Amino acid sequence: MLDNLKKDIETKLFNAEVFEGAVLPPVDLTPAPPHTGADISLTWAMSAAKTLKKNPLEIAKAAVKVISEVTFVASASYAAPGFINIILEDSFISSSALDRRLKNRKTAGENKERVLIEFVSANPTGPLHVASGRGASLGDSLVRIFNALGIQCDSEYYVNDSGNQAMLLGVSLKARVNGQEPPENGYHGSYLIEMADEIREMSKDWTEEQFSIYAIEYLIKTHQRDMQAFNVNFTRWFRESELYKESLPAKALDFLKEKGLAYEADGAVWFGTTKDNDDKDRVLVRADGRPTYFLADIAYHKNKYDRGFTTLVDILGADHHGYVPRMKAAVKALGENEESFVPIIHQLVHLIEGGEKVKMSKRSGRFITLKELTEEVGADACRFLFASRTPDAHMNFDIDLAKKRTNENPVFYVQYVHARAASIARMAEQKHLQQAENLVDFKLTPQERTLLIKILWFKHALKNCVRDMSPHHLTTYLIELAGNFHSFYDACRVVDEDNPQTTAHRLLICDRVRERIKKGLEFLGVSAPEEM
């Protein structure tokens, strides 16, 4: 595996006489650009130049001599301004590409890291918006990838089921039941008209609180159904009301007061966040005694840490930039490492149809909800395309492209390779052709070699997703793997009854491609069809 090769290269470099006594940076293996003709490229010499105080090209020249002695390295070369390019032995490629392991071998209990990723967390005051789909795709994919790499990771949806908005929702629903317009500051969506029609008879004697409870529960169930249809299953749906049942906001406030971090002014209780780069201090308890949402958020995050999570990832919508400095200040006040709080802000989604933007307004009635978009193009296309951009990039979601069943559509392109590989396996089985157990002594064609090298980089792509908190590395990898498979399939006849040995080896290669694509799609929450 590449992890072992990396360690072997580091061991050789760190013990080399030419670098003796120097503090050297770790080695980072990356795929070599096609024009180099190599398999692996290192920028190590340029990183080492800072500590060695030498020209990167001189360092690269010295490093190449050392790396050339590493087992399974066929050759190494250098290029300006200090790149190191490595060609691997075919035997290493053939054996390593068959290794299915993703998790590092750790002794039991060694990895104490526990990650909690909170995402979507939309208010239960209306249907889920399209942007929630982007957050869901991002969050759920990361949870799956973390766990695949052996890092314990849970997912959570925070439900704002109490407070003023819940009361306003109840008032708005009651107005609809009575054939009236909701108050100006209430909720005016057509979904409340449909809800009112369902309960008009049964709700004649209801109080406003009962209307509120019914509406909140109805919409929470709607959100849960939408997430399930989107192939997202949260570890826990955490309700804000749970915080108040346990008096956690009050306890969090006492904690801050004891540390001298909360103060009273103008009849309210404040948290001094300006000293931590916030633009103003924040109110925790209003002058009328009502706690703010910020106090509830502090209590909620304290609860996360108290449950044993070591890293808290909050995936937030584009309008939450102001939330980050105050929450970082709160984490610091709770006595936790600021680095343990990882906010990710994803940008908006613009829907494109017929080459034009779809107006995202309630009046247009077009694709306002995630449910409508999912039903129109399918959860697979939504999830893959949402995951294909970095969170900080604005996204144009092309509805026409998402519906295409051609290679222009990246999710179809990748899924089709899985279906083709499955079809090849079925054909071989019908012809009673056996798959090889390994690729020992099998001479690789250039297309086979390229394909196997791409299989090697699967775990590397997953690690990059974790490093950058973005699954786009995986979608890019799968698209490239699919392209390599097409080149292999066009150049190499797989099922050839006259050459059973070659067929056996190529069936094994196809099977490994199928496995990698299936796993990769699974980590993105996308299906891997056996037939298309």
Curated annotation (Swiss-Prot):
SUPFAM superfamilies: Anticodon-binding domain of a subclass of class I aminoacyl-tRNA synthetases, Arginyl-tRNA synthetase (ArgRS), N-terminal 'additional' domain, Nucleotidylyl transferase. Gene3D superfamilies: Arginyl tRNA synthetase N-terminal domain, HUPs, Isoleucyl-tRNA Synthetase, Domain 1. It is found in: Cytoplasm. The keyword ATP-binding applies. One of its GO terms (cellular component) is cytoplasm. Monomer. This is Arginine--tRNA ligase. It comes from Elusimicrobium minutum (strain Pei191). The gene is argS.
